[in-house]
């Protein structure tokens, strides 16, 4: 039976819009799993990450054993889960667990800046991009490339593609219709 927290983390993973985790401090256990469920993870230089459940006779229960493998690889996932030790933000960046590490005082603004860059794009195209990239987690390369090609072809006929090309040629910001 799934618990409320598992459902919440899965719901976060399933959001069709881009998600960003902003971590300032400890992201241990469920906190690390929530961060792993986001598309982009930004951490302060004082952040720590870990899956300490092994110290309680448990394993991560909200998807970390699966999502960490995709982020940091098999060996680092095994190390994190089996030792239960924390890693600092510098190691999290080096391992691929986070996208960026910034000074704590700059974390909020840096995260907002990334969100604004993403938010300035076509929401329709972002949704298709997220779906297409996610397919790489569950299917082979050949099938994934075919799905990407189909998504590209579909977007090529979209209103937002016309708007984007026109904006690029005219050297002005795009006014997306999100279609």
Model-derived features: where do they sit?
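Short beta-strand->loop
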Residues: 140-145
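Extended, non-globular alpha-helical segments
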Residues: 1-11
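Short, charged, surface-exposed hinge/linker loops at domain edges
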Residues: 133-139
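Crotonase-fold acyl-CoA enzyme core
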Residues: 10-124, 157-158, 163-166, 170-172
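Short C-terminal tail/terminal secondary-structure segment
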Residues: 137, 173-179
């Amino acid at each position: 039976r799934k618990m409320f927290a598992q459902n919440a983390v899965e719901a976060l993973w399933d959001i069709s819009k881009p998600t960003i985790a902003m971590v300032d401090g400890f992201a241990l256990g469920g906190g690390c799993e929530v961060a792993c469920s986001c598309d982009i993870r930004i951490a302060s230089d004082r952040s720590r990450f870990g899956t300490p459940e092994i110290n309680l006779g448990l394993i991560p229960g909200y998807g970390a054993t699966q999502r960490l493998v995709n982020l940091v690889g098999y060996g680092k996932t095994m190390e994190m889960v089996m030792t239960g030790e924390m890693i600092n933000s510098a190691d999290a960046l080096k391992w691929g667990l986070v996208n960026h590490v910034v000074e704590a005082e700059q974390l909020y603004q840096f995260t907002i800046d990334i969100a604004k860059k993403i938010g300035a794009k076509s929401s329709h195209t972002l949704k298709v991009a997220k779906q297409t990239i996610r397919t790489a987690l569950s299917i082979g390369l050949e099938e994934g490339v075919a799905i990407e090609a189909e998504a590209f072809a579909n977007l090529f006929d979209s209103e937002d593609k016309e708007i984007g090309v026109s904006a690029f040629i005219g050297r002005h910001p795009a006014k997306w219709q999100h279609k």
